[in-house]
Regions:
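Short, solvent-exposed amphipathic alpha-helical segments in soluble enzyme
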Residues: 37-41, 99-101, 191-194
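N-terminal short beta-loop-beta anion/metal-coordinating cradle
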Residues: 1-87
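Gly/Ser/Thr-rich loops at beta-strand to alpha-helix junctions
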Residues: 25-30, 90-92, 119-124, 156, ...
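Secondary-structure boundary elements
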Residues: 46, 103-114, 167-172, 200-204
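Catalytic cores of processing enzymes, dominated by hydrolases/peptidases
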Residues: 123-200, 236
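Hydrophobic/aromatic beta-strand patches that form the interior of the parallel beta-sheet core
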Residues: 49, 82-84, 113-115, 172-177
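Internal, conserved structured core segments that host functional sites
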Residues: 92-140
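A conserved C-terminal secondary-structure "cap"
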Residues: 184-238
Length: 238
């Protein structure tokens, strides 16, 4: 069986040596994607590359009349920060491959920290943010940001794969865990996550006042993209 091949086309110079890579793929409640959108809009990021694969649905997102790939890399070279931003919810069979792809890209560009995130549904609805680190340096960074280090737990998906592979390779990976809602635009979780990322990434900021609007827009686009992908797959086998 052939492994999925992810392709990057860089559109402009990228200089994020010793900086940060933020994983913005949607997770539970869409908060990861929404928080990434807020960082992009608030902190002056620009599209620097597109990511494509034959395993991705053939979907174009039209914004202000301009076609866009649903998965892109945004960069703020002055802050040394890159964001993998996506409106695609990847099937779990692609999670390990995407994690390896991110780690390879991070190594190529000299990234010091990869920041990923995932929503958890805490029984007591706690608002406390916790994080796990792949290395001692990553765990120290978490504590310096005033965030509790997760001591015991299970982290699935792309974040879990990034942690495991980062532990083996020595790449600093920080996985932020936040309390997630089951349904609806996840404004509260997005705000919590965005503030946590801004503590970890110097110079990054969030516009909390616009998060609610961005949450609704991002959720709508992600759901539409998922529906289009589902319809395409169903049409292939009729």
């Amino acid at each position: 069986m052939n492994q999925p091949r992810f392709k990057i086309k860089e559109l402009k110079p990228i200089n994020v040596q010793d900086g940060f890579l933020v994983d913005g793929f949607p997770s539970a409640g869409f908060a990861s994607a929404i928080a990434s959108e807020s960082l992009i809009h608030t902190t002056g990021f620009e599209v620097a590359a597109i990511i494509d694969s034959d395993t991705f649905p053939p979907v174009s997102l039209i914004k202000d009349g301009i076609p866009n790939y649903p998965t892109r890399i945004f960069v703020q070279n002055e802050l040394n920060v890159a964001i993998f931003s996506s409106y695609l919810t990847l099937h779990e069979s692609l999670h390990k491959q995407m994690a390896r792809f991110m780690l390879s890209w991070a190594k190529k560009h000299g990234i010091k920290y990869i920041i990923t995130s995932i929503g958890v549904r805490a029984p007591n609805q706690t608002e406390q943010i916790v994080a796990a680190g792949s290395t001692e340096e990553a765990r120290k960074k978490i504590l310096e940001a005033g965030i509790h280090v997760l001591q015991h737990g299970t982290i699935p998906g792309i974040p879990g794969s990034l942690l495991n592979q980062g532990m083996l390779s020595g790449q600093n990976v920080i996985a932020v865990l936040f309390n997630s809602m089951e349904q609806g635009p996840d404004f509260k979780s997005s705000a919590q996550l965005c503030m946590a990322i801004s503590k970890l990434v110097p110079g990054a900021s969030c516009d909390i006042s616009t998060l609610n609007k961005e949450a609704q827009i991002a959720e709508k686009i992600i759901k539409e993209t998922d529906n289009e992908a589902k319809n395409l797959k169903e049409g292939m086998y009729q």
